[in-house]
Structures are given as structure tokens and as C-alpha cells.
């Protein structure tokens, strides 16, 4: 089984999507799901003394403008193991440009954690935490000499629109998967 191609994007898209976690919160290792094999590979170790502030992964059967699956960040109280599948509720959209490519990311919370039951939109997330995430992405490739432009945050509706668009982009690239 290849989780990228064989899982649906979610049980109730775009309200609830599957997040396949590649990188646990607190890691300096950047793992990526290999699109061909479905195995996890080490892409690189971050050059900076930074660590991922959230669990980070992809939404299956999506594709985005950076020529990769659509990224998703899941706010968890404890880090989860790579390749964990989380039913996640999109609450926001982080907008950034990475080396000239649009590289937007969904921000989500786990459906099955009562701690986040009232988090429905970006305004429910403490601003200080959003600032930490933005700071991480602004600086994490700096020592590699790559430029990141942070455009800011949008709410849940923008995230849901981009998820639906990323599903259509997947279908265009890989053909409709039944």
C-alpha cells in the first residue's frame, strides 16, 4: 500500500482530511513520503538549530504548486510517530513563497482530541503560536541560502478551498483514482 496514492484525502473533505505525518513536532530531521514507494525517506537534517513546531505531513491524493503533495501542519499536544494518519480539521492556511514557488500549508487540529474541540478557525489559535510557526518557516532554510517569503495567515475557509483545489491538481497530474 502506498498511503499517498491509496488513501482518500479524508473521510469528510474538506471539513475533515487525513494528515499523513512525515515529521514529528520537535524534530530537526526532515522526512518525506516517497511518492513512488510510499516509504519514508530522510530528505535532510535542518541546517539551522531549529525544530519543527508542529507535526508536519501531507494530505493524500493532493498536489500543489510547489510540485509536491499539499502540506498540512497538525497542532498536537504530543508528537506522533511518522506515518501516523490523523483525522484533522482544517482551521487555517499558512501562505509562504519558497525559492519563488507558492508553498502554502494547511493548519489543522486533530478531530479526536477534546482539547481542540472548540478550535474551528485561525482566530482560535494563540497569536504567539502562529508567530512561532511563521518564524520557523521564515528562518529554517536561511543557512542553506534559500529565501522564504512569509505572506501570512488566512482562515479555515481559505484552507478548505485550497484543499479542494489540491485534490483537483492531483487528479490532473496522476489521473482520477477510483
Swiss-Prot record:
Keyword Transmembrane helix in record: no
E.C. numbers: 3.6.1.1
Function of the protein: Catalyzes the hydrolysis of inorganic pyrophosphate (PPi) forming two phosphate ions.
GO MF annotation: an example: inorganic diphosphate phosphatase activity
Keyword terms of this UniProt record: Cytoplasm, Hydrolase, Magnesium, Metal-binding
PANTHER family linked: INORGANIC PYROPHOSPHATASE (PTHR10286)
Annotated Mg(2+) 2 binding sites: 71
InterPro entries listed in its UniProt record: Pyrophosphatase, Pyrophosphatase_sf
Catalytic reaction(s) noted: diphosphate + H2O = 2 phosphate + H(+)
Amino acids binding substrate: 30, 44, 56, 140
Pfam families: Pyrophosphatase
Protein name: Inorganic pyrophosphatase
Organism: Pyrococcus furiosus (strain ATCC 43587 / DSM 3638 / JCM 8422 / Vc1)
Amino acid at each position: 500500500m502506498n498511503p499517498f496514492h491509496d488513501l482518500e484525502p479524508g473521510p469528510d473533505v474538506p471539513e475533515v482530511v487525513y494528515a499523513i505525518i512525515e515529521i514529528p513536532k520537535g524534530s530537526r530531521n526532515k522526512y518525506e513520503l516517497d511518492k513512488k514507494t510510499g516509504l519514508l525517506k530522510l530528505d535532510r537534517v535542518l541546517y539551522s538549530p531549529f525544530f519543527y513546531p508542529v507535526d508536519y505531513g501531507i494530505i493524500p491524493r493532493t498536489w500543489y504548486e510547489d510540485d509536491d503533495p499539499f502540506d498540512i501542519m497538525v497542532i498536537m499536544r504530543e508528537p506522533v510517530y511518522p506515518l501516523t494518519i490523523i483525522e484533522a480539521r482544517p482551521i487555517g492556511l499558512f501562505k509562504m513563497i519558497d525559492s519563488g514557488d507558492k508553498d502554502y500549508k494547511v493548519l489543522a487540529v486533530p478531530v479526536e482530541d477534546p482539547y481542540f474541540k472548540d478550535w474551528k478557525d485561525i482566530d482560535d489559535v494563540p497569536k504567539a503560536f502562529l508567530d512561532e510557526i511563521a518564524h520557523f518557516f521564515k528562518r529554517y532554510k536561511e543557512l542553506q541560502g534559500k529565501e522564504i517569503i512569509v505572506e501570512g495567515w488566512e482562515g479555515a475557509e481559505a484552507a478548505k478551498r485550497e484543499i479542494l483545489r489540491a485534490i483537483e491538481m492531483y487528479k490532473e497530474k496522476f489521473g482520477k483514482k477510483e
